[in-house]
């Protein structure tokens, strides 16, 4: 039976006046009619959205005096960047002019590589594949500050749980135009996330708070809550996620993560969107089909813009 249909059928059965053996077929038919799965992930879209709204986190950011790199939303950012193609050892090429990237054209671009004497070859790459040669670049540093708080948006991805049999994983992805990290690993663009895992009935089971290349899973008692919304403390600069105020060790000797009270409180349930799946985006969120980088290419991978959520390993795991 399709995920979410049993819960819907149970609800309809409880509302029915007649015996189950007389109305079972009619109830099942009604449940099928109400069951919608536009992104073909095997979960009813309405049930996905119900869980997404219920567990959308409250994100507490560091004070402005400590961290100036604030969140944004995809459309705000696309209106302030151009798309370029990195030719190693040769001049980069512009693919989309400043302010012309959109959700509809981001993943439909193609560009030929360069060979001897930096001439274009017959080898063509496409922006809907995992190609880090494509990258988005702001014209100046002003974009790094992020959008006004009224425009911050969280991007939701739901899937069948990788941890709990019959359960669900609800991912909440946050976008920042800049990662002002420690040492010399600053880079443009930053996609961070947490994942709330539920049981088959949609009850909270645990939450994964991503931090750098890893993360930690927490039980309900280890988290702070605002009603049904888990509270997330975002590290200044790098935006890693932790459950409390404090100092946290990292894998880099001599550098720690710090979280604070006293900064903006981002209640993500006020502005979120379910993006669906890469092969079938929901709510016109076609940006998830773009496989290039979201920021400028630096000297190393660590100082270069990251790829989007659906091209990161955690998309199908945590």
Where are the predicted features?
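C-terminal motif of bacterial Sec signal peptides marking the signal peptidase cleavage site
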Residues: 14-16
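Bacterial signal peptide processing site
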Residues: 18-20
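Exposed boundary/loop context
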Residues: 10-11, 35
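Fibrous stalk/shaft segments of extracellular and virion attachment machinery
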Residues: 28-34
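Short beta-strand micro-motifs enriched in acidic
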Residues: 197-201
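Sec-dependent signal peptide recognition
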Residues: 2-9
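A domain-level signal for the mature, folded cores of soluble proteins
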Residues: 35-192, 202-318
């Amino acid at each position: 039976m399709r995920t979410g249909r049993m819960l819907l059928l149970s609800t309809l059965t409880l509302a029915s006046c007649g015996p189950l053996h007389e109305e079972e077929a009619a109830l099942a038919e009604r449940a099928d009619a109400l069951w919608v799965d536009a992104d073909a992930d095997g979960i009813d879209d309405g049930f996905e959205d119900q869980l997404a709204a219920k567990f959308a986190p409250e994100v507490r950011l560091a004070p402005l005096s400590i961290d100036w790199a604030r969140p944004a939303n995809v459309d705000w950012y696309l209106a302030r960047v151009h798309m370029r193609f990195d030719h190693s050892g040769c001049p980069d090429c512009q693919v989309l002019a400043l302010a012309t990237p959109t959700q509809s054209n981001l993943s439909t671009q193609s560009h030929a590589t360069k060979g001897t004497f930096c001439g274009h070859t017959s080898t063509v790459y496409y922006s809907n594949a995992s190609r880090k040669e494509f990258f988005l670049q702001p014209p100046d540093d002003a974009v790094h500050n992020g959008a006004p708080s009224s425009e911050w948006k969280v991007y939701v991805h739901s899937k069948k749980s990788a941890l709990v049999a019959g359960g669900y994983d609800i991912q909440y992805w946050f976008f920042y135009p800049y990662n002002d990290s420690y040492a010399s690993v600053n880079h443009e663009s930053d996609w961070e996330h947490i994942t709330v895992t539920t049981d088959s009935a949609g009850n909270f089971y645990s939450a994964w708070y991503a931090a750098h290349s890893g993360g930690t899973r927490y039980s309900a008692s280890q988290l702070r809550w605002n009603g049904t919304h888990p509270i997330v403390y975002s590290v200044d600069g790098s935006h890693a996620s932790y459950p409390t105020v404090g100092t946290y060790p990292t894998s880099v000797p001599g550098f720690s993560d710090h979280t604070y009270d006293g900064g903006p409180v981002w209640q993500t349930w006020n502005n979120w969107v379910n993006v669906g799946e890469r092969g079938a985006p929901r709510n016109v969120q076609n940006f998830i089909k773009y496989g290039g980088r979201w920021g400028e290419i630096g000297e190393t991978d660590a100082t270069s813009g990251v790829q989007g959520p659906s091209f990161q390993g955690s998309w199908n795991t945590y």
